[in-house]
């Protein structure tokens, strides 16, 4: 059977954007509504051309009285069409009540969890979602009203990991015409007209009002969406460009912002925060922007995550307690917070000191106002380009009466030369070597 104009356009979208490849298994998220029923029928008609296999999945959210009707409808339809369908029930109202979240948010989370699990368990490559251009408009408006950044504008994509949206750039009226023209049955979700749901209010109140200003609202928003995607792609290239300047150091992610502009710094801050599972809000971003020209500072992002700046370095880190002091005695390995030392008879690293008398040697944190040879340790760390957020974690190696070594900052000359019975305290592992080595040529090694 030849393709009609709409089906051909969907095929071209799939081929142009490489949504489905030969041999792929595709799972259609089938609610039974107009959009998902049209998507299922189009993919069934295209499956031979695409050389793919089509499945369907339906989750009964147990929210509406007619949910059983919808479940039975999609099951019966797929059985007649020869399509394998996966059907499950999930008590979304209880799920939302237990987690104190809204019905819309909870239903979406439950649905995606279900779809991903079905795909994984059955070796299915792609999940096909029936979002259309009107859905895109409504979602962007919803995100803007809630307060969003770039990610909110590019909230839906034609392809997003294992999810595809072949109908994303088609208007709802095109889908309605296709359904009517082909006599495709569907069920109507009566809650789509309930204005207590935010998306319905946007659909039935906000969008019609905006169309009085621009009758071609959908295409206007698709242009905004396209621009957002171009900017997002630029940010991805930016992250790749500076990937060698981003370091994961224990419970920190640190990046070197030297010679970066404000836009680049903020995008890297957002990226690194995201790697720590923190989504920066507008207020936090504005606060970071306001402090960019300051040399050192700290901002709490959550109860256990903070962002700190020292010189050109930014650190997004988990808050944690650190060891204050560690005694060094017999030869062996010593761990001081994230630093690893070894006391042995041999030089085993580039960073080391000779220990002439093992008695009374310890590794500790610096003390407030502490001086070495009359110079404040803080000033020495500043001269050595140690970022402020690392200074309290720098190990200070002491004997009973003097500081003999602060790695990357100071070494007492008397402990740089071996004596007859000396042992060697080697720095084996330094979690911040990637940062400290960057400015090594600028450091003052001895006093």
UniProtKB/Swiss-Prot annotation:
GO terms for cellular component: cytoplasm. Keywords: ATP-binding, Cytoplasm, Ligase, Nucleotide-binding, tRNA processing. Its EC number is 6.3.4.19. InterPro entries: Lysidine-tRNA-synth_C, Rossmann-like_a/b/a_fold, TilS/TtcA_N, tRNA_Ile_lys_synt, tRNA_Ile_lys_synt_N. It is an enzyme of class 6 (ligase). It catalyses: cytidine(34) in tRNA(Ile2) + L-lysine + ATP = lysidine(34) in tRNA(Ile2) + AMP + diphosphate + H(+). Pfam families: ATP_bind_3 (PF01171), TilS_C (PF11734). It is found in: Cytoplasm. Gene3D superfamilies: HUPs. One of its GO terms (biological process) is tRNA modification. GO terms for molecular function: ATP binding; tRNA(Ile)-lysidine synthase activity. ATP binds at residues 31-36. It comes from the Bacteria. Ligates lysine onto the cytidine present at position 34 of the AUA codon-specific tRNA(Ile) that contains the anticodon CAU, in an ATP-dependent manner. Cytidine is converted to lysidine, thus changing the amino acid specificity of the tRNA from methionine to isoleucine. The N-terminal region contains the highly conserved SGGXDS motif, predicted to be a P-loop motif involved in ATP binding. Belongs to the tRNA(Ile)-lysidine synthase family. This is tRNA(Ile)-lysidine synthase.
